[in-house]
């Protein structure tokens, strides 16, 4: 890997998705390399992010920078959420009753029993309100296709996995605690977080966001849902997690590029 870096040169910064895999660690710890890690995913277990081995860690927000707790951390924002916040949803429902296409985003449910448990209250709502139910699996999850087929074998649902959330046609969402909540919030589409744990990343939001800790609570929140009631909560959520979609990554990378050229010029470039 050191030979690879030497061939590529040092006049350009190395932008990494992580500095905790073998090859990325080798690059990040090279004394001549200027590198930056782009935050990828929520800062839950900090062992996946700390210590910061790269020159810099580009965090999504002030909150993420605080969680990383390193002098190398920069509040940089992210392209993804900045882009999503500029999109306008085709649907804008005020209540759950108005929803025509409801998306369930799975993250922690993996076995057929877990998936069936998660779907049960939604199927009850579907029977009562007549909406179309869509299910999206986390693209990086270890879902078994057989387990999923078993869970939905008798249900009228649409299945998604690799598709980007913004390409799916839906107007309401139920989300098992994951980064997907940010995607949906950026799109301006109402959602309810489903979180039956007590120590998840989203625990701090249980008094703010509509959060279902049980099937019974999910049913109640859905029936009583009002977008006007929760819109301030969604906006506060975006402010805390991604600084309302502000993105400085471009300018920061240009700055790193200038630093590299000033420091190394052509000395290490082929």
Question: Which residues are covered by each model-predicted region?
Answer:
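Active-site and donor-binding regions of nucleotide-sugar-utilizing enzymes
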Residues: 1-81
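Structural motif
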Residues: 13-22, 39-40, 56, 59-62, 101, 105-110, 171-174, ...
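Short, aromatic/basic amphipathic alpha-helical patches
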Residues: 27-31, 68-70, 122, 144-155, ...
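Catalytic binding pocket for nucleotide-activated donors in carbohydrate/polymer assembly enzymes
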Residues: 69-71, 75, 152-153, 179-243
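Conserved catalytic-core segment of nucleotide-activated headgroup transferases in glycan assembly
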Residues: 75-150
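Leloir-type glycosyltransferase catalytic cores
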Residues: 108-117, 208-270
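Donor nucleotide-activated moiety binding/catalytic core segment of transferases
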Residues: 139-187, 191
């Amino acid at each position: 890997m050191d030979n690879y870096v030497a061939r590529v040169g040092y006049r350009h910064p190395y932008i990494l998705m992580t500095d905790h895999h073998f090859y990325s660690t080798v690059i990040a710890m090279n004394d001549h390399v200027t590198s930056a890690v782009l935050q990828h995913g929520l800062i839950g277990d900090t062992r996946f992010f700390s210590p910061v081995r790269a020159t810099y860690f580009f965090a999504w927000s002030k909150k993420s920078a605080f969680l990383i707790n390193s002098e190398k951390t920069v509040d940089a924002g992210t392209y993804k959420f900045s882009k999503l916040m500029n999109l306008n949803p085709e649907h804008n429902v005020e209540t759950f009753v108005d929803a025509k296409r409801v998306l369930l985003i799975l993250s922690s449910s993996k076995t057929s029993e877990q998936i069936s448990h998660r779907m049960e209250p939604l199927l009850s709502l579907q029977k009562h309100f007549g909406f179309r139910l869509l299910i999206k699996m986390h693209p990086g999850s270890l879902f078994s296709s057989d387990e999923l087929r078993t869970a939905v074998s008798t249900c009228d649902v649409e299945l998604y996995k690799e598709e980007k959330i913004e390409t799916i046609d839906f107007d309401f969402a139920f989300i098992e605690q994951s980064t997907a909540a940010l995607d949906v919030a950026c799109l301006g589409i109402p959602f309810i977080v489903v979180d039956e744990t007590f120590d998840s990343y989203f625990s701090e939001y249980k008094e703010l966001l509509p959060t279902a800790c049980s099937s019974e609570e999910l049913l109640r929140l859905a029936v009583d849902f009002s977008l006007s009631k929760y819109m301030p909560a969604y906006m506060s959520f975006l402010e805390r997690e991604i600084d309302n979609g502000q993105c400085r990554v471009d300018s920061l990378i240009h700055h790193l590029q200038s630093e590299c050229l000033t420091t190394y010029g052509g000395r290490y470039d082929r």
